[in-house]
Amino acid sequence: MVVALALAALLVWTGRAQAQLLMVTGEYQVTNVDRAEQRIGIALRGDDPDRRQNWVHVRADTKIVRRVWLRGGAFRDEFMTWNGFFDYVRKGTKLKVHGGRNWDGTIQAKKIWL
């Protein structure tokens, strides 16, 4: 009985686990932007662009890279800030996301390529 109470108390004091279940990488299109909640709605490329399939949470430490194409087929990769990303991204923007899947099914972005 005492052991059961001790385990219950331990679970209450430690709080909810924040670990990520698995890492995912995929190519998506943006369906909506929720800057206030720091997230974007996504759908797989080729699926209905008006129907959100999942949320991707973008934090200040997320690495965001945008590829800029130059003349002659050359390109330059530019790092973007969090604010720059939310200013740039719109419905229909194509992107590649690498991150961890949270317990609720959403994706916590570690890297985003535009």
What is the meaning of each model-derived region?
Residues 61-63:
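Small-residue (G/S/T/A) turn/hinge positions that recur once per unit in extracellular repeat modules
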Residues 66:
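A short-motif feature that recognizes glycine-rich, charge-decorated loops
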Residues 2-55, 69-114:
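Short, flexible, surface-exposed loop segments at domain boundaries
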